[in-house]
Amino acid sequence: MLQLRLLPTFSMGCHLLAVVALLFSHVDLISAETEMEGEGNETGECTGSYYCKKGVILPIWEPQDPSFGDKIARATVYFVAMVYMFLGVSIIADRFMSSIEVITSQEKEITIKKPNGETTKTTVRIWNETVSNLTLMALGSSAPEILLSVIEVCGHNFTAGDLGPSTIVGSAAFNMFIIIALCVYVVPDGETRKIKHLRVFFVTAAWSIFAYTWLYIILSVISPGVVEVWEGLLTFFFFPICVVFAWVADRRLLFYKYVYKRYRAGKQRGMIIEHEGDRPSSKTEIEMDGKVVNSHVDNFLDGALVLEVDERDQDDEEARREMARILKELKQKHPEKEIEQLIELANYQVLSQQQKSRAFYRIQATRLMTGAGNILKRHAADQARKAVSMHEVNTEVAENDPVSKIFFEQGTYQCLENCGTVALTIIRRGGDLTNTVFVDFRTEDGTANAGSDYEFTEGTVVFKPGETQKEIRVGIIDDDIFEEDENFLVHLSNVKVSSEASEDGILEANHVSALACLGSPSTATVTIFDDDHAGIFTFEEPVTHVSESIGIMEVKVLRTSGARGNVIVPYKTIEGTARGGGEDFEDTCGELEFQNDEIVKTISVKVIDDEEYEKNKTFFLEIGEPRLVEMSEKKALLLNELGGFTITGKYLYGQPVFRKVHAREHPIPSTVITIAEEYDDKQPLTSKEEEERRIAEMGRPILGEHTKLEVIIEESYEFKSTVDKLIKKTNLALVVGTNSWREQFIEAITVSAGEDDDDDECGEEKLPSCFDYVMHFLTVFWKVLFAFVPPTEYWNGWACFIVSILMIGILTAFIGDLASHFGCTIGLKDSVTAVVFVALGTSVPDTFASKVAATQDQYADASIGNVTGSNAVNVFLGIGVAWSIAAIYHAANGEQFKVSPGTLAFSVTLFTIFAFINVGVLLYRRRPEIGGELGGPRTAKLLTSCLFVLLWLLYIFFSSLEAYCHIKGF
């Protein structure tokens, strides 16, 4: 932050030193002209004048010939007022740029037709980025200079002035030399920034130099000293021509007409952008407003549009993976933080990394200067607070339900046939707990029948004041018959509330719903498991889905149709697309031992969470053939742990039944288990043995329908939801825009912390610095005043746009009068005042914005690429509009619009020469030794920055010498 604040201050110091040197070099002229009368002003155009003219708004400060002390006082007042007006213009320009960001971020929905006939919908930006940069963005950045030129001409009876044109040229020089010098220097040593859209830079740079060359041509070559109507209009019409050329260069419509262009979703803004490639054989058509768009029908999105859906999906996936990576890194770096804090950190980091417009950097710079804080951090914190608030509101609503709800604790209950009774729990939640609530219950047959499988039960449950839970019991009838699992239902009905208002103490039915009602579930299903069979073992379902963040997943193995005896069921995991060994899950195998009457066991498998945005991997969990275990086998297994024994047994009708355990006197190191098969299949069975076999076959444990469970590992829902929320919040128009006047007034009176060096800790609350407080109190008047400007939510930003530009025009009129009166008070010509002071005041926000863009952006386009385009727009709009109006006015009156070519033509020529040097140096820096227009080795940075600062000082020096006739101009 220290560097951010000192470097622009250093450039301001250069300005002031230049002015001081200029004043001292002309002290003899100023002293000689101290006694000059007003009428002598025309006798010497080469000297400054103490005779002030009436401004567009401000009157003359009488008397015209004050004492030396009064001059110092007046100059101080004018200077302070001018600086304060510059602060006001910066703040209203902030609102203006916010509206432009919202306007240029407008989207339109389109329908994408895939080759297979499927259609999906997506959005595209309406405004082309290059067009918006050269039109609305440039207008927002240069509105004070443009309006100053127009207001000066219109406010002085359509006569040419020096303040407006000189401000435009001076601002162009400051932008081209000082701002670029600063951007070159602030990039960290060893890092570089290159211009990404070089062809657009070439076009705008060429038009920028041409604009000032054109000024010289119409002032000194075509019609010296006179601006004709066609010259003014042509100057203005060069503006749309420049925009079209830049757009053509950006879209390659001339030289790249036959190069196939594909469109994909941009990672940063969620928009569809274009790149080149080979034309595929299949096309994807796009519909907008019901019309199919292709290269033969329409010229949508600046050219032939064939959208590669698969590639767009890949880019979306890449963006989501990047979001997921950021969240994982933050979670590892800050394990102690809650999810809301991690969302805030991730949101801020995502917003910081994405590509931003010139408007955003201008807004960010202004708010940092005026104590309004870092808008990215404020936005991230607001989003996190909103998420917490919504959670708290939902929780509070659920807990404060005014109606008592009566329902079963769970919708399903299970019991064994020999359990005697089954207990069902009824819950009372919400409402007034001081009331007494009555609810009826009644059993109903399902596959189980009352009287043979369970006891029919009905009654009324009474919840006394303060009671929230009651229990009812239903009798279960046991038998010795093998049968399938059966179920019956228990219903709740007829909720009543006790009240003293009625004679019987019970509310009428039509009054009950306001105090109590049935909740969900109001019906419970009771399943009776048969206990006369060893059981059928199965999973609940063939497929299950689990989140990768589950940690330990538990899978139930059910024992149905009986629960008699102890049974061992082996299980194991099998790899599918998911890999074991700790990559996607940990390999698991073992045995489940079901005790007598035990009907469910769980298998635990550890799932590895690698926090992928999208995941769909499978593995399998399989159970093996169950086997019945008698007590003798359990003893054998226990002795096995002690060591040394031999098991002898026999197969009974195909099933291993263990009978005896013979322990050795002296245990041996290795356990040896010998199972002797005593049953011979060839031996005929007696009738008794046949009956025993039939009964054993009927009662043995078997596998059920689902013996192999497919486990599908999916991404974490919470993790994916968080990433999706971050994806949706990357539109910067939501960050800089406002939704209500209330929001604007709160923001206006709130002082926030500015930039800091520890960006990673943005989740921690930062206190405003002394600088933040000072700047806030200096600018709070402007903040509150401009809070009356309509929010950017209205009319899609156009209401804010119109009101803001009117406010800028009013303040610019004041600035023009103050600058002119300040100059005449100290004896400076308007051309010098404009080049130095006014150009400085209007360029300080751009200086901060370019510095931030140079350090944060991956490319140099946002920091210096727009400087050249802005310079061209200043001439074509600022001078073109003003001179066109004046030329038409004078032509209508049969007069000529006269403009003195001297100072302006000289400044324009000087600037053009230096601009060629500037552009040449920037292009040379793209060589591999340096690597880019900005940054590079420290020595190269210093030399480049010093050269550009020297060019600006020479421009100021020679322009001032020519203005005071020390050197001859044109």
UniProtKB/Swiss-Prot annotation:
Region (Putative calmodulin-binding region): 251-270
Metal-binding listed as a keyword: yes
Gene Ontology CC: nucleoplasm; plasma membrane; postsynapse; sarcolemma
Alpha- repeats: 138-178, 839-875
Keyword Cytoplasm: no
Regulation (activators, inhibitors): Activated by micromolar levels of Ca(2+). In the absence of regulatory Ca(2+), channels open rapidly, and then inactivate rapidly. Inactivation is enhanced by Na(+) and is inhibited by micromolar levels of Ca(2+).
Glycan-modified residues: 41, 157
Pfam families (alphabetical): Calx-beta, Na_Ca_ex, Na_Ca_ex_C
Binding-site residues for Ca(2+) 3, renumbered to this chain: 417, 479, 481, 483, 530, 532
Binding site for Ca(2+) 6: 584, 610-612
Binding residues annotated for Ca(2+) 4, in chain numbering: 453, 479, 483, 486
UniProt modified residues of type Phosphoserine: 282, 389
Domain of life of the native organism: Eukaryota
Entry binding sites for Ca(2+) 2: 417, 478-479, 531-532
Catalytic function, reaction form: Ca(2+)(in) + 3 Na(+)(out) = Ca(2+)(out) + 3 Na(+)(in)
Domain notes: The cytoplasmic Calx-beta domains bind the regulatory Ca(2+). The first Calx-beta domain can bind up to four Ca(2+) ions. The second domain can bind another two Ca(2+) ions that are essential for calcium-regulated ion exchange.
Role, per record: Mediates the exchange of one Ca(2+) ion against three to four Na(+) ions across the cell membrane, and thereby contributes to the regulation of cytoplasmic Ca(2+) levels and Ca(2+)-dependent cellular processes. Contributes to Ca(2+) transport during excitation-contraction coupling in muscle. In a first phase, voltage-gated channels mediate the rapid increase of cytoplasmic Ca(2+) levels due to release of Ca(2+) stores from the endoplasmic reticulum. SLC8A1 mediates the export of Ca(2+) from the cell during the next phase, so that cytoplasmic Ca(2+) levels rapidly return to baseline.
Protein name: Sodium/calcium exchanger 1
Gene designation: SLC8A1
